[in-house]
UniProtKB/Swiss-Prot annotation:
The active site is at residue 145. InterPro entries: HtpX_protease, Pept_M48_protease_HtpX, Peptidase_M48. Belongs to the peptidase M48B family. The keyword Hydrolase applies. Binds 1 zinc ion per subunit. This is Protease HtpX homolog. GO terms for molecular function: metalloendopeptidase activity; zinc ion binding. Pfam families: Peptidase_M48 (PF01435).
Length: 303
């Protein structure tokens, strides 16, 4: 859950900075100088929308480490850290991925994966999770996070965020222009956007931004089911993932920082529409009803 919320908040911050900069530089005044230029507005919205999303993606790993105070294991200091690194290495090898950075952070049970690409990823687990689960369950959680990396979920989320950013910026400014024209009336000569445009476009941007987050969280929940299935495949058995989820259901799952809420193993919001994760019961049911992952059959040799 951590990854998505961090990504969303970073994205909002970047979009806000880019939007304010554009306003200061007079981009809005240019777009409305001779009536609203819809084509140029759409191009501007796409540039800011996708630009903000990709900047957030590039910052994701650094922000994740900072917000959780995660410590990257460069040299294992004990047997548990050595096991953790070795398990991630084995799972990554099965998934055909480069070895990600492995980190530990203090807190209640949770885990996350993040990074701008499969070759620059990070897998982190909390001390609370390591203390509350047996190694097979922890391995399943690690497999879930490795599956996120294998599925390219951060890049997918970035593209989705870029699309919704574009629509938010485009619609908020287009409606702001209409509101401004309505408030001015037909008799007032237009000399660029007025106060009605500035206030209404910002208000629309906030409202549409909240609605857009529902779309992003919907796709995030879908990716969680895929990561659970991917974990079962990497483990060669769905039971460890089911057991891990049941263990989480009996614990007080750690609340990752709001800006990181989308890539943790557990979590969700107070309202289902704004939750980055499906209910644990739904995830367990999906795993139980899925076809068991195939395991290699030993070849028979003739005597």
């Amino acid at each position: 859950m951590k990854r998505v919320v961090l990504f969303l908040l970073t994205n909002l911050a970047v979009i806000a900075v880019l939007s304010i900069t554009a306003r200061i530089l007079g981009v809005d005044r240019f777009l409305t100088a001779n009536g609203l230029n819809m084509g140029m507005l759409l191009a501007f919205a796409a540039l800011i929308g996708f630009g903000g999303a990709f900047i957030s993606l590039l910052m994701s790993k650094t922000m994740a480490k900072w917000s959780t105070r995660a410590r990257v294991i460069e040299r294992p200091g004990n047997q548990d850290e050595a096991w953790l690194v070795d398990t991630v290495r084995q799972l990554s090898k099965k998934a055909g991925l480069p070895m990600p950075e492995v980190a530990i952070f203090d807190g209640a049970p949770n885990a996350f994966a993040t990074g701008a690409s499969k070759s620059k990823s990070l897998v982190a687990v909390s001390t609370g999770l390591l203390q509350s689960m047996d190694r097979k369950q922890v391995a399943a959680v690690l497999a879930h996070e490795v599956a996120h990396v294998e599925n390219g979920d951060m890049v997918t989320l970035t593209l989705i965020q870029g699309v919704v950013n574009t629509f938010v910026i485009f619609l908020s400014r287009a409606l702001g222009y209409l509101v401004d024209n309505f408030l001015r009336g037909d008799n007032e000569e237009s000399t660029g956007p007025g106060i009605g445009y500035w206030i209404s476009s910002i208000a629309f941007e906030i409202v549409f931004g909240v609605l857009a987050s529902i779309v992003v969280m919907y796709f995030s929940r879908k990716r969680e089911f895929r990561a659970d299935a991917g974990a079962a495949k990497l483990m060669g058995d769905r039971r460890p993932m089911i057991d891990a989820l049941r263990t989480l259901g009996g614990l007080q799952a750690g609340q990752l920082p709001k800006e990181m809420a989308a890539s943790g193993i557990a979590g969700g919001g107070m309202m289902a529409l704004f939750s980055s994760h499906p209910p644990l019961e739904s995830r367990i049911a999906a795993l139980e009803s899925a076809t068991p992952p195939s395991t290699p059959t030993p070849s028979r040799r003739g005597s």
